[in-house]
Amino acid sequence: MSVAQVVSIALLNHRREVERLTGLVERFGEAHRLAADDVSAVNLLLDEIVINIISHGYDDPREHQILVTLALENGVLAIRVEDDGRPFNPLDVPGPNLDLPIEERPTGGLGIYIARSIADQMDYRRDAGRNVLTMKKHMSGA
């Protein structure tokens, strides 16, 4: 029996759902014998992206789905995150000024900066009223 190279999960826009995503990434990493550092990096990247969507993406209190797909091919993990929140292109967010003392830095943007620094490639598009963020990360142990 072969191990799935693609796995998806539908999350609700609640912070507690991030635990389900973390578990999925860990199981996927184990199944494909990915390096622990790579699995941790992917979990941090997804944590930053998904928490940002949950915290800032919606104008109403309704439940929304956030779809996350992982696909491994030739040692490269493709990650797709899709949501129906407000249009938001994380590539348009300027990086934080890390030279300023932390108490003088404006609030926001650090999580996106972290995610962008972890991903080897990041692309955004708006499609049929949905944000679609696609990222690629080279796996050292794949």
Question: What kind of region is each of these model predictions?
Answer:
Residues 23-47, 104-106:
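Conserved short strand/loop->alpha-helix "switch" segment adjacent to the catalytic nucleotide/phosphoryl-transfer site
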Residues 48, 52:
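Conserved polar catalytic motif of the HATPase_c/GHKL fold
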Residues 64-71:
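A conserved short beta-strand within the histidine kinase catalytic ATPase domain
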Residues 71-79:
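Short beta-strand-loop-beta element adjacent to the nucleotide/active-site pocket used for signaling
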Residues 79-107:
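Glycine-rich/acidic phosphate-handling loop/turn and adjacent ATP-lid/helix
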Residues 104-119:
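Glycine-rich phosphate-binding loop
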